[in-house]
Amino acid sequence: MTAAPPAADRVARLLADFDAGKPAALARAVSMVENQREGFEQLLTTLHPRIGRARRIGVTGPPGAGKSTLTTQLVNAYRAADLRVGIVAVDPTSPFTGGALLGDRVRMESVALDPGVFIRSLATRGSLGGISSATRSVADVLDAFGFDRIIMETVGVGQSELDIARAADTTVVILVPESGDSIQALKAGLMEIADLFVVNKADRPGAERVRNDIELMLGMRHGLAVEAAGHHGVDLKAMANPGKAARDAARKDDSATWTPPVILTVAHKGDGVPELATSLDRHQHYLGASGELRVRRRRRLREQVMDVAEYRLHRRLWNDPAVQAFIDTSLPRIEGGEVSPYGIIDELLIKGAPAIARTSP
């Protein structure tokens, strides 16, 4: 039986096919990174200099808001402009298999067979947020492969909204006209992370009300009514319609400030999608002109460094037999009240794995 080639050789062959633009190589690279198989760090290290050209767009919102349908329409708009699109869809985890419970290929079947589109569903795997630990690295692989746009869609529950904002250049929050969504947006802190709001299913009653509520909140947040005041006092028109003031500010082509626009869409008809695509382009221009893009990407790099550090520490310490033996032999001391779990970790960090290995029975 022929022995499997070393990991370095497998990665080298994979990279050769990857550089040749073979879709199968892209799929294998994504799987290697997602599952952290042997060689994935070498792969990401080699690809790192090629990363940074793609625009990363995060899409989040409550279940049933039509995120996948709207994403499909946005993909169609980008493909019409001859742009290649990668989609990373984070799905709930199956409690039995640990895999994505509902792959987005089912919901995006109209674009799934397009050679200029790549779709991968990732599982949350029990993480508190909707973004799996591998999402940013998978996006890096798609970036290095040459995709122009990378859309990251999340389940929109828990802390996933914050996760998506950290992973994307631009964050789109999708709401629906049903009562309470706009107030819930404020409670969930979405006002702080949304770069664009979309009220989807706008053919339902209440869409204009939700948009006005969001624009009112934006107006209060950005102080637009106050800014509109003349030197003799308050602009009564702006105070009477702060939502319109926010809307007008959102349409300004100003590289120094950004007011999130609120866009009405009917995704299954394609209504509002051109305006959404235009607003995404405007926001990208703002990010570049204001320097905010560099700030966001540096913050993302810092978080990736911390993720790598956490992974390495976990692999080198918690998987070390000497460390496990030290913890096991320390359990009686914890039970007897001699030391707390925190004290054991302090001892572990002070001694370090090499010292523990020398003193373990």
Regions found by a protein language model. Name each.
Residues 101, 137-138, 163, 167, ...:
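Alpha-helical scaffold elements adjacent to nucleotide-binding pockets in ATP/GTP-utilizing enzyme cores
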Residues 196-284:
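Canonical P-loop GTPase G-domain recognition
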Residues 256-259, 263-267, 271-356:
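Long, well-ordered amphipathic alpha-helical subdomains in the mid-to-C-terminal portions
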Residues 9-20, 27-65, 70-160, 167-182:
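Nucleotide-state-sensitive switch-loop elements of NTP-binding domains
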Residues 1-49, 233-245, 324-329, 344-361:
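Non-catalytic terminal/linker segments enriched in charged/polar, low-complexity residues
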Residues 22, 91, 153, 200, ...:
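Residue-level signal for inorganic ion chemistry
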Residues 44-63, 71, 93, 159, ...:
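Glycine/charge-rich, flexible interdomain linkers and switch-proximal surface loops
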Residues 177-205:
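Flexible active-site lid/hinge loop adjacent to a nucleotide/diphosphate
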